[in-house]
């Protein structure tokens, strides 16, 4: 599974599972899982609300990472195959 591979990679890199990259990775997995669920169950409004909350959390973490370390941010979005944040 991708999660186990990423966890082992993160453990080699640093012992902290609370890193921004790891949190974004977990949120991305949850988002993908909820998206596939909502394709089948379109009227599941509680899941839609949960998806919006997780999207907001991931967006805030990515904004923080892009401000603090642009190189790590670019590597992460390429690794997870997600789009770059829109800037205002």
UniProtKB/Swiss-Prot annotation:
Residue pairs linked by disulfide bridges in the UniProt entry: none
Key words of the record: Chloroplast, Plastid, Ribonucleoprotein, Ribosomal protein
Classification via PROSITE patterns: RIBOSOMAL_S15 (PS00362)
Gene3D superfamilies on file: S15/NS1, RNA-binding
Record bears the keyword Acyltransferase: no
SUPFAM superfamilies: S15/NS1 RNA-binding domain (SSF47060)
Tree of life domain: Eukaryota
Subcellular location: Plastid, Chloroplast
GO biological process, one term: translation
One MF annotation (Gene Ontology) recorded for this entry: structural constituent of ribosome
InterPro entries, per database record: Ribosomal_uS15 (IPR000589), Ribosomal_uS15_bac-type (IPR005290), uS15_NS1_RNA-bd_sf (IPR009068)
Main localization of the protein described in the UniProt heading: plastid
GO cellular component: chloroplast; ribonucleoprotein complex; ribosome
Signal peptide limits: none
Family affiliation: Belongs to the universal ribosomal protein uS15 family.
HAMAP family: Ribosomal_uS15_B
Name under which the protein is recorded: Small ribosomal subunit protein uS15c
Organism of derivation: Lepidium virginicum
């Amino acid at each position: 599974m991708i999660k186990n591979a990423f966890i082992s990679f993160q453990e080699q890199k640093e012992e902290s599972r609370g890193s921004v990259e790891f949190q974004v990775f977990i949120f991305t997995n949850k988002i993908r899982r909820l998206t596939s669920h909502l394709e089948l169950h379109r009227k599941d409004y509680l899941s839609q609300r949960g998806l919006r909350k997780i999207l907001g959390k991931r967006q805030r973490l990515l904004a923080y990472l892009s401000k603090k370390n642009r190189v790590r941010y670019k590597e992460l979005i390429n690794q997870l195959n997600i789009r770059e944040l829109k800037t205002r």
